[in-house]
Amino acid sequence: MVTIVEVKQHIKKFAAGNELYLQEVLGCHYENDIYTFRVWAPNAQKVWLVGDFNDWDKSLEMSQTLDGVWEIKTSLPKEGQLYKFLVKQADGREVMKIDPMAFELEPRPGSAAVIVKLPNKKWLDGAWMGRNKRSNHFARPINIYEVHASSWKRHTDGSLYTLKDLQKELIPYVKEQGFNYIEFLPLTAHPLDASWGYQTIGYYALERTYGTPRELQDFVEACHKENIGVLADWVPGHFCINDDALAYYDGTPCYEFSEKWRAENKGWGALNFDLGKPEVQSFLLSSALFWLEFYHLDGLRVDAVSNMIYRDYDRSDGEWKTDKFGGNRNLEGIEFLQKLNRTIKGKHPECLMIAEESSAQVKITGRIEDGGLGFDFKWNMGWMNDILRFYEMDPLFRKFNFNLATFSFMYRMSENFILPLSHDEVVHGKRSLMNKMFGDRDKQFAQLRNLLTLQMTYPGKKLLFMGSEFGQYLEWRYNDGLDWAELKDELNAKMKHFDQDLNSFYLNEPALWQLEQREDSVQIIDADNKDESVLSFIRQGKTRHDFLIVILNFTPVDRKKITIGVPYAGKYCEVFNSARKEYGGSWNQEKQNLKTQNNSFKNFNYQVQLDIPGFSAVILKPVDVHIKRRINRKTKTK
C-alpha cells in the first residue's frame, strides 16, 4: 500500500526529474476496492475523470494536489472499462485527453485508456538473465534480425499476426536462421500504422494490435529460453501531435518545448520533447525502465538521436537559434541522454543501449565522464550509406569509387558500431536490398551474397531487416506481410540457405567478434586493388592461430590466380565461398587448399594465389601455419 507520504515523495522526485517509477504513482491504481487516478496537468483550470462508468459526464471532478498533479479516488470503475481525462485547458477549452501512463489503450480509432491489472508473471528465464549479466557484449557475437511486428507475416485472411502467433513462428525461424537477437520497431502504442510506431502516444502501453502485456512477456521469455535476446526501438525525442494525446496537454507546453520553433518537428509532423524539463525526464526515464524491467527486454535502440542533440537538425538557416555557447548543440538533449544511460547502466549494466545517430561530432559511445553520451553501440550510418551507394553502381565504375568500400576502415575505432541494413533502406522508393544490386537477377543475388558477407566479416555488430535474408524483390510494405511465396523460387530459397550458413559461420568464428574493440583485430591486406576491385583483409581472434582472411570481388569477372598476402608460411584452406551452387551461384569447384609462396606481398612476407569467382566473397583459414613463438626475456636486476 502506497501511503500519502510516499505519494508526495514520488511527486517531489517527479518534479525534480529523478522519479524512475512514475507509473507507480500517476495513472490508474487499484487498492482495497478503490481506484485512484492521478494526472499531471499543471496549468489546467479543471480536470474530470470520464469513462464508461459515469457515461462520460462531468460527475467526477478531480482535485489538484501538488506540483501540478490532479487526483481522484472512486469505486465506480470496473476492470476493462474505458476512461479519459477531460481537461479544461488554460484557455478555457475542454479537451478529452488520454492517460499518458496507461498500460493499454482501446482498439483504434479510439484512444481511451483501458482499466487493467498488469500480470504478475513468474518468470522462467533466469538462466538467460544470469548469463546476460555476466556477458561482455563487446566480445561476443551480436546478430540482430529487425522486425516490424505486424508485417512479418499475415494470416491467409489478411488478419494480423499477434505476439502469440509470432511466438510460435518467428522464434523458431530466427533460431533456424542463426540470428541471436530480435529487434522490434516500436512496440509502444501509436495511432497510425503508417508511422511504423515512431509516432508514439502511449509510452507505457503496448500497441493493442500486437497483443496483450502478458503475451509480450511470454514472447520474451520464450526467446530467452532459445538464447535469443529481444530489443525494441524507443522514441524519446519526439511524440505524436494528435490533440487527444500528449500535445499541449493542459493547453500549454507540458511535454514539448515552450519555444515554438523548438517544439515543432515539421519533417516528421511531430512535437519534440523538452528534454531539459524535470517532469519530462521522469516520464521518459520511467518509461525506459518499465519496458526493460516489466517485459525483460534486453535493450533499447534510441531513435533519432541527432534530432535530440542538435538544434539545427533538419532545419534551414533562420529556423533555429544557437545555444548559450553560440553553437548548434541541444545541451538539454545531451544531458538527458547521459542521464538516461547513467540510469539504465546503474540499474541494468547488462542491457544494451543503442543509438541511431548519423553525425560524427559527438562521441555517442564515449564514456559520460569524458563528455560522451554513454551508449553501448551506435548504428554506423556512414558505412551503410557508402556501401549501398557502392553496390548500387555499375561494377565498371566501382574502381573509380573504391573508397566507398574502404573508407570506413579509417574510423572504425571511433565508436562501438552496429552495421545496419535496416528498414529505412528498403522503403519509400529506395527498393529492396536485393533490388538495389546492379544487373540482372542472377547478378543481383550474387552481389547480395557478397554484401552480406562483407557485413558479416567487417568489424561491428550486425543488423538485417526482415525479408533481406531471402532476397525479397519488393520493398517492405508496412500494411502487408513479407512475400513468403518467393521462397518457391530456387534463387530465393538458396539465398535463405546462404544466409543461414553465413550467420552460423559468424556465430562460430571468434575471430569475427572476439577482439572488435582492439585496433589489431583487423589487418588490411590490400585496399588498393581498384582496377580489379578486389578487397582483402584479416580478422584476428585471441590466439595468433585464430584468424580469417576475407577476399571480396566486386566485379563479375572471375579472378584467376590472384595474389593475396598472408602473415605466416604454411597451408590455408577455403572455408566459405558465396558463389557456390548450393547458394545460387555457379561455382562448383572443390574447396581450395593453398600453400604459401616465399614471396612478399604488400606488408606481408608470404603470399598465396587463389581463384575468386565474379561477385564472390571467399574466406580462408589457416590449416597448418608456422608461427614463431614469442620469447619474453627477463632483464636481470643488479
Swiss-Prot record:
Annotated metabolic or biological route of this protein: Glycan biosynthesis; glycogen biosynthesis
Keyword Glycosyltransferase included in the entry's annotation: yes
InterPro entries reported for this sequence: A-amylase/branching_C (IPR006048), Branching_enzy (IPR037439), GlgB (IPR006407), GlgB_N_E_set_prok (IPR044143), Glyco_hydro_13_cat_dom (IPR006047), Glyco_hydro_13_N (IPR004193), Glyco_hydro_b (IPR013780), Glycoside_hydrolase_SF (IPR017853)
GO BP annotation list: glycogen biosynthetic process
Reaction equations catalysed: Transfers a segment of a (1->4)-alpha-D-glucan chain to a primary hydroxy group in a similar glucan chain
Keywords: Carbohydrate metabolism, Glycogen biosynthesis, Glycogen metabolism, Glycosyltransferase, Transferase
Function recorded in the entry: Catalyzes the formation of the alpha-1,6-glucosidic linkages in glycogen by scission of a 1,4-alpha-linked oligosaccharide from growing alpha-1,4-glucan chains and the subsequent attachment of the oligosaccharide to the alpha-1,6 position.
Protein name per Swiss-Prot or TrEMBL: 1,4-alpha-glucan branching enzyme GlgB
Species this protein is from: Lactobacillus acidophilus (strain ATCC 700396 / NCK56 / N2 / NCFM)
Classification of source organism: Bacteria, Bacillati, Bacillota, Bacilli, Lactobacillales
Gene: glgB
